Amino acid sequence: MTRGWRAGTVQRLEEVPATIADGLRTRFVGERNLAVMRQYVYDMTTVAEEEIVATLRFVWQRLKIIIEPSSAVALAPLFTGRYPAPGRRVGVILSGGNVDPFHLPEEITGAHG
């Protein structure tokens, strides 16, 4: 997604990357989505798997909300400082429609099997 947005053209990956954020796992972003992103997205960054898990854990422990990993990807740059926004109001939509609480990593829920 980031490669295509930066290049301004569809970038196809040979393999689908492994990630906990399965809602974002794709070989490429289509032409229409890329056009919308190029028009409205100001900047884009990536986050590591560990940062996704840390964000999931934070939201669960502090807000008592289970969000899907793809949703955590949108919030993680604020926690890591990749999107610095001191003193600014920032809106992030958190969703949980694509999550199976029984398959969340143990480090998020604190469950021991």
Set out the residue ranges of the language-model regions.
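PLP-dependent amino-acid enzyme catalytic core
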Residues: 1-113
